Design a protein with these regions (language model features):
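Conserved acidic segment of CheY-like receiver
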Residues: 1-11, 16, 20
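Conserved sequence signature across two-component system core domains
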Residues: 6-8, 32, 50
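Short, glycine/serine-rich, charged loops/turns that create anion-binding
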Residues: 10, 36, 84
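Alpha-helical interaction/dimerization surfaces of two-component signaling modules
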Residues: 18-23, 41
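Conserved Asp/Asn-Gly motif in the active-site loop of CheY-like receiver
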Residues: 29-36
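CheY-like receiver
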Residues: 39-91
């Protein structure tokens, strides 16, 4: 599986990527610290799964998820957040 990880906090992004790489099902993971770069990548490259922070500057994870699904309808989305108030709207 090919994955992307998107988080605007570098420390959290590093931890997320390390956790993803520990999965034997993920063969490749690309990391991005902003939504625009991630979306540009998805428009040019097929991915299987996207791990997204929800609360980011600019577009934000929820809006990015919608745009990823438009570009890659079969992509799975996993939201990663420490904010309880975002958990329900993410579904």
């Amino acid at each position: 599986m090919i994955a992307i990880a998107v988080d605007d906090e570098k420390l959290m992004l590093g931890a997320l990527v390390a956790a993803i790489k520990a999965s034997s099902d993920i063969s490749e993971v690309s990391q991005f610290s902003n939504c625009d770069e991630a979306l540009d990548y998805v428009k040019e490259n097929a991915i299987d799964i996207a791990f997204l922070d929800i609360n980011m500057r600019g577009m934000g994870g929820l809006a990015l998820a919608e745009k990823i699904i438009e570009a890659c309808p079969d992509c799975k989305i996993v939201f990663c957040t420490g904010y309880e108030e975002y958990a329900i709207p993410a579904f």
